[in-house]
């Protein structure tokens, strides 16, 4: 009898371990990224760039530059620089990061200053109904994002459609 009890306990431990591993794996896929920089670079990994070193321009907020550089993926070739709204038209930035403008201002800038392919990302546009193509927002202990399909189309940057699944996953993560 003791043999069968030990065998049963070992079996139960294995089942509990497998359930725990499965639970942890599912959480790792659904948990939002921990900061705006990781979330931004995760999104950018789904983009197809016409250059090997895309230019990421932070609009009107040079204080974020050091954090973007520190959080950039190890083998990335992003050229990260601050620019003002007045410099956008001549910047030819492939990525525009907005952090302190309204959605209305973002949309105006995209319509009036950007006449080249550029992907726009904002962490100050929670509704994401106009303005940037990708809108980051705080969710629980991390960040999630929404996608504005009109702005994404306007960006003229090819994005792998799997990013839509990532957005849906980040939206539904508890």
Task: Report residues per predicted region.
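Bacterial N-terminal signal peptides that target proteins for export
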Residues: 4-16
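Short hydrophobic alpha-helices and adjacent helix-cap/hinge residues
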Residues: 10-13, 29-174
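Bacterial N-terminal signal peptides
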Residues: 18-24
């Amino acid at each position: 009898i003791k043999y069968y009890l030990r065998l049963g306990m070992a079996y139960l431990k294995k089942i509990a371990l497998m359930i725990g591993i499965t639970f942890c794996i599912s959480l790792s896929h659904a948990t939002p990224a921990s900061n705006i920089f990781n979330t931004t670079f995760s999104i950018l990994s789904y983009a197809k760039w016409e250059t090997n070193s895309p230019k990421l321009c932070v609009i009107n907020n040079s204080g974020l530059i050091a954090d973007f550089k520190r959080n950039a993926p190890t083998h990335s070739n992003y050229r990260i620089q601050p620019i003002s709204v007045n410099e956008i038209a001549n910047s030819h930035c492939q990525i525009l990061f907005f952090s302190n403008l309204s959605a209305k201002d973002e949309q105006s800038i995209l319509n009036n200053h950007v006449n080249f392919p550029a992907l726009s990302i904002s962490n100050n546009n929670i509704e994401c109904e106009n303005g940037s193509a990708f809108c980051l927002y705080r969710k629980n202990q991390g960040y999630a994002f929404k996608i504005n399909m009109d702005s994404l189309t306007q960006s003229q940057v090819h994005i792998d459609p799997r990013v839509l699944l990532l957005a849906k996953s980040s939206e539904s993560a508890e």
